[in-house]
């Protein structure tokens, strides 16, 4: 009897140990440590992490609305980290002026960060600590709403001349307003802050799209690159199918007259659906060939600007091929030159979209992250029945000959969901970030709405040319239906990125005021 009892005890202990071990193993499989907090309003915008002077931890700016019966009030909430490494608490809450159309963050030379507000006729600054609003300047812009329906986060601020200071760029109908922050600015914010900027206008008009019944205006896309090899960034845009540049001169300002940069290949600065014929109609998609200049930046790591062109060939609405051509810049006698034919290109089955240029392994060369999906009749019918469509994620890398291979170095599948009843579509999570501070980015992909797969970045070694591990780590969590609501940022500035998640209208009601932070263990 004693022997039987002892045996039962041993079996019980073994089972307990096994179950406990499995539970611990399951717990260890979680890749991130999670923390969360809730706010007392509905979050409406992507969360904005910003650096604050003399603070190792970044501050979170959270935009949303307060609902009171039939009235909604837009507000900005400032959240700061407490002593606990993952907990954020409210520091200030500010109501936006009802005339605010758009906003951005602006860092002054004193390293103080303020909010830039744009209305239909003026620029103002908002102090996040005091809530005070100060007029910066009257401004002409293409945004002519006195009481906008919503507030947009727009890219109003950019270091356009490469001096390390934030500048302001506001499009108007005929010109581009450029406010250059100069190094002689005072170390404090006061009512004369406009004196800290050189105000100028570049002859870069808005993009006009006109049909027989309406006309619309949009921002002109621009680039800032050094194209004359004087060490200064120049202001570049596409005009009438030609590359046009305003050269940088003294004090970080730009020349008043533009210069044409001759290129040996044809391209457009407008997507094909904005190009109209003599009859005012858009292009015939049964016989369409179009090349759009997508980006100008150094891609192959030689510190010379390169050009990326998106090429579209269509023989029907459901029969379209999209590829990307890359023209690598060269310096000849102080001039930026390109070959007539593309140096390399990227093609893949399906329709390519959402291309991003990212240096995945910190070698100075850009990898290409791009998605692909089929839009044939059978795929559309299948998607309507299932409520989702498969989407491939590819990463292409330059080889030793500065050529993108025919096959991607990374290929995985995610799903894009949509609802016929609500008309809303979900987006998968597709994010690159460095979770362990080794300067090699990981790839994060969602699997449904409850799991992330993490493919660890790694060094290329002899016999192993892979940038990512073949097997993924897993993390289970409640993901937002819209993967764009997940962002990556190094919140405590330790070289390791965190994930910040919020939720939207496609998610459960109780999640709409919740913020989740994921930090690698």
Regions found by a protein language model. Give the residues of each.
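Beta-propeller-forming repeat regions
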Residues: 22-521
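Bacterial N-terminal signal peptides
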Residues: 10-17
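Bacterial N-terminal signal peptides that target proteins for export
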Residues: 1-9
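Coiled-coil-like amphipathic alpha-helices with heptad-repeat character
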Residues: 1, 21-22
């Amino acid at each position: 009897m004693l022997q039987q009892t002892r045996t039962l005890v041993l079996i019980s202990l073994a089972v307990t140990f096994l179950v406990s071990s499995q539970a611990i193993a399951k717990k260890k499989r979680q890749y991130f440590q999670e923390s969360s907090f809730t706010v007392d309003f509905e979050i409406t915008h992507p969360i904005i992490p910003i650096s604050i002077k003399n603070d190792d931890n970044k501050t979170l700016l959270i935009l949303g609305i307060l609902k009171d019966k039939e009235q909604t009030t837009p507000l900005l909430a400032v959240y700061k980290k407490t002593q606990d490494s993952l907990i954020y608490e409210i520091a200030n809450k500010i109501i936006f002026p009802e005339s605010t159309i758009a906003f951005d963050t602006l860092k002054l030379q004193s390293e103080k960060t303020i909010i830039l507000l744009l209305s239909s006729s003026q620029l103002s600054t908002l102090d996040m600590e005091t809530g005070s609003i100060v007029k910066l300047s009257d401004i002409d812009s293409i945004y002519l709403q006195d009481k906008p329906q919503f507030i947009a986060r727009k890219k109003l601020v950019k270091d356009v001349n490469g001096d390390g200071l934030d500048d302001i760029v506001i499009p108007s109908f005929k010109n581009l307003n450029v406010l250059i922050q100069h190094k002689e600015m005072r170390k404090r914010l006061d009512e004369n802050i406009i004196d800290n900027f050189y105000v100028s206008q570049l002859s870069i008009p808005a993009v006009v799209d006109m049909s027989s019944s309406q006309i619309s205006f949009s921002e002109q896309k621009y680039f800032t690159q050094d194209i004359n090899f004087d060490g200064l960034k120049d202001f570049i845009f596409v005009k009438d199918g030609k590359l046009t540049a305003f050269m940088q001169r003294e004090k970080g300002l730009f020349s008043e007259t533009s210069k044409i940069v001759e290129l040996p290949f044809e391209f457009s600065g407008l997507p094909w659906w904005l190009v109209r014929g003599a009859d005012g109609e858009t292009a015939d998609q049964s016989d369409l060939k179009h090349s759009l200049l997508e980006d100008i930046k150094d891609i192959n790591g030689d510190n010379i600007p390169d050009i990326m062109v998106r090429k579209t060939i269509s023989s029907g609405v459901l029969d379209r091929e999209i590829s990307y051509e890359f023209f690598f810049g060269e310096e000849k006698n102080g001039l930026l030159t390109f070959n007539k034919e593309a140096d390399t290109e990227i093609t893949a089955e399906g329709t390519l979209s959402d291309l991003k240029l990212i240096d995945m392994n910190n070698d100075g060369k850009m990898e290409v992250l791009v998605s692909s999906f089929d839009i044939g009749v059978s795929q559309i019918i299948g998607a309507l029945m299932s409520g989702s469509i498969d989407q491939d994620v590819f990463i292409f890398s330059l080889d030793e000959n500065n050529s993108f291979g025919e096959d991607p170095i990374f290929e995985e599948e995610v799903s894009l969901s949509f609802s016929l009843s609500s008309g809303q579509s979900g987006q998968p999570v597709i994010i690159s970030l460095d979770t362990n501070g080794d300067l090699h980015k990981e790839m994060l992909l969602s699997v449904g709405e409850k799991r992330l797969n993490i493919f660890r970045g790694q060094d290329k070694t002899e016999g192993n040319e892979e940038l990512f591990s073949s097997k993924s780590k897993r993390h289970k969590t409640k993901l937002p239906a819209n993967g764009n609501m997940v962002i990556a940022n190094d919140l405590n500035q330790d070289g390791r990125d965190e994930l910040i998640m919020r939720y939207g209208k496609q998610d459960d009601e109780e999640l709409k005021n919740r913020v989740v932070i994921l930090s690698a263990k």
